[in-house]
Amino acid sequence: MDLKFSNFFKEAEHPALVKKFDKSTTDESSSKEDYSTMSDLWKMFSKAKSELSNGRRVENLTWRLMSINLQKNLTPNGDSNTLTPDTFSDPTAPSSAQSVPPTSSAETTADNSDTEMKLNPIPAYSVPADTTGSSLMEFNYIQRRVRKTSFDESTAKSKKRSIADSHFPDPNAMQRPHDLESQPFSYPKIHASNSFNFVKRDIDSSNFSNLDASALPISPPSDFFSVHSHNLPNAPPSIPANSNNSASPNQRIKASPKHADTDVLGLDFDMTPSEPSSFPENGGFPSFVDANTHEQTLFPSSATNSFSFEHGSAGFPIPGSVPSTSYHANTASEDGFSSSYNSQGLFGISSPLSSGVTPNQSFFPDVSGNNIFDVSRNNHEVSSPLIQSPGSYVSMPSINMVSSLPISAPVPNSNSQFPRRPNTFRTNSSKSVGQGSSGVDSNQENAESFNPSISSHNSAEWASGETTGHSSNSPLPGSDMFSPQFMRVGTAMGVAPVRSNSSNNFGQNFFHQTSPQFSAVPHRKVSAQDTNLMGSSPGMYNHMPYLNRATSANSITSPGVLPEGMAASLKKRTTNTAATPQAALPTTLDTKKDRSVSFNINKNAEKPTVSNAAEDKKGDANTRRANATNPTPTCTNCQTRTTPLWRRSPDGQPLCNACGLFMKINGVVRPLSLKTDVIKKRNRGVGTSATPKQSGGRKGSTRKSSSKSSSAKSTAADMKPKADSKSISPGFVGGNQSLSSERIPLDPSMRSPLQQQSSENESKSQSMLSANNLNAGVNDFGLGFSEGLGSAHLDSNDSSMVQGKNDFAPVVDSPLFDAFDTDLGMSSVAESHTMNMDPSDLSRVSKSWDWYSVM
């Protein structure tokens, strides 16, 4: 400060300014007087701030000067962090050891005695150390006003306590008298050793008077997500035991706040969204309390703190967060409960966000070589998450990095004295996640190595819903109480129903859907040959649009398990989903070759023998199967591969633009004899939609009927269609268009184009008879009307044709009826008795709404 400015303050009227910059007054008595004068100066400006232009700024300046002067006075006492006195406090407050000596009346004059600020005593507990990071606040140095109540402010660091404050006991709780008014907050009775098994038995509220502060586990709020080892018997050497933050097991039995018996209901705590709720012990909800965890090793992870509940003296569970991160083999958390469950997620019906699982987490981690599950197992029975056994509780971790789903949740001990609660995941308990079970994201492909307790389920047993000891296989949550036919489960694409169908591996797949984190987890792409995952679980993954097509198509590989009416809808959904039916449908029913039915009409249809060698090769079964995987679609009626627009038949098969429009307009299948007429009339040219590349009979775009007809006559005699004595193929083979249409009933030995798995050992005499009947039914291109869907003639006015249709009208169990009339309760598409009908005669089942799906 320069000399001019110093002289200005020395010449000021107020003596406080003069003394402030007078270097002669530096002794201790003058410093005390400086404080008094600065207080008077601040009071003067605070009263006159309304009259001054910058009154607020001047008042703030004097306030700061007064506080600086006070801090200088308190520095020799070693209490530089003590706050400034409150000018509004009561002078008659009780004294304390840390109070600053008040200014004596001898050192003050009579003029300022009425306005002198007497320093009030500051209780030790009323001004706690600042741990909230508010030291940068402007008025942090101001002393908090001493309240006239006996409220202990050391228990409340702020108005809204943090999560750590609400979960850890006060280390000074035993040092203060047990006063109800001084203990407004009730702390959860938490013990860092997870030794709830003997704490619940031995703790007694009457012994609280014998406790001291050393018995309490002290955990600062900053250690909320850190790992503490608490002198457990089997604590690994890699985690050092912190003796400062732990107590011996004998001390920990008694370690509970002295005011524990005052919190009767256990409800006066801060519930955050990540905490589970507390429920009565014998109610319909579980009390998630860990048990038998003091005899196992710690779980070496810093992110798996488990919320636990301890029963107080009144018998009500009180929530808390245990800082110990022990992971034990004899608790239910070893059996896969390592994900973030809340009280709603345990019941299998939870929103995708309730568990906090990120999409990059695998909900079935690879357990081989994973230290997470490498824990020593003792021959103890593990209590189920919702069935309580004596002295046994379930540890539900709230924060972890490994999300897994339970495969087996063991049943409780037989001597359980508590009422049985509905088990969430009630399956056989012969195997657990830690013993090498596998899931969707595991690399084990053997179905039996997945989990024998699940893969060997008796479907009738789990469907009955009986819970008989170790054989209780009810997959639905609490299925002994309720078992809905459909459940609404949140998926990644929204809410979709889950069908409760019985199958061998159904319990495994149900866990993948009803768990909270299932909906947010992307799935590994399952091939159609993964029968251990998908083959025996019909309809499980059909409501999930994010699965691949082969998975949804493979869901009907076990037709015997499908209920009535469901197989048809599943088949229709699978057929409409597949973009190329030749690629998707042949693998759909590949596992059951004796019952296989493919809707690819031209897949196994026999071709006429022509001079082209490629056509002979296409007639081979292996080549046809390889051709089925060709991504290029083929018209199921005229066999063409080039068309300006692809359409679909009512059963979902691809049709060219001409055949699709003809079927949509006329309601019947377009005859192959009309193919050249349509092309000739419109003068399409080479490479049009009606070019039958597979027939090989037509070389150009224009029709030369004489040569084509003669070639067709010569090749028709060599055609030998496959025969099947079980097949009944009602239909009509029309003659050439120039001839009158006559009704020729097909021989029963003729093979329908849709029934593609034909037997090779039929007699050739029947084949020759069928070939003779087809001689009159060869079109201009050498292609018989049995090829494709050409059995229906265009001439709908022919009475003989209509009469023939009526002859076969009573036969109705056709796959086409299953694909549309699912309300009729038809049987499954893939069952053997549904293959006795030729569905190519679409006019027999046509309705007014059938052809809306052609587009």
UniProtKB/Swiss-Prot annotation:
PROSITE patterns, alphabetized: GATA_ZN_FINGER_1 (PS00344), GATA_ZN_FINGER_2 (PS50114)
Listed Polar residues bias regions: 72-112, 445-476
UniProt keyword annotation of Phosphoprotein present: yes
Subcellular location: Nucleus
Transmembrane segments: none
MF annotations from Gene Ontology: cis-regulatory region sequence-specific DNA binding; DNA-binding transcription activator activity, RNA polymerase II-specific; DNA-binding transcription factor activity, RNA polymerase II-specific; DNA-binding transcription repressor activity, RNA polymerase II-specific; RNA polymerase II cis-regulatory region sequence-specific DNA binding; zinc ion binding
Biased composition (Low complexity): 240-250, 428-444, 625-643, 707-717, 755-767
GO annotation (BP), single: positive regulation of transcription by RNA polymerase II
Modified residues (Phosphoserine): S150, S727, S729
An annotated GO cellular component: cytosol
The entry's keywords: Activator, DNA-binding, Metal-binding, Nucleus, Phosphoprotein, Transcription, Transcription regulation, Zinc, Zinc-finger
InterPro entries, per database record: AreA_GATA, Transcription_factor_GATA, Znf_GATA, Znf_NHR/GATA
Biased composition annotated in UniProt, kind: Basic and acidic residues: 149-168, 614-623
Chain positions of all zinc fingers (GATA-type): 635-659
SUPFAM superfamilies attached to this UniProt entry: Glucocorticoid receptor-like (DNA-binding domain)
Region described as Disordered: 72-126, 149-184, 229-287, 412-483, 602-643, 680-768
One Pfam family in the UniProt entry: GATA
Domain of life: Eukaryota
Cross-referenced PANTHER family: BOX A-BINDING FACTOR-RELATED (PTHR10071:SF281), TRANSCRIPTION FACTOR GATA FAMILY MEMBER (PTHR10071)
Protein's job: Transcriptional activator.
Protein name from the UniProt record: Transcription factor gaf1
Organism whose genome encodes this protein: Schizosaccharomyces pombe (strain 972 / ATCC 24843) (Fission yeast)
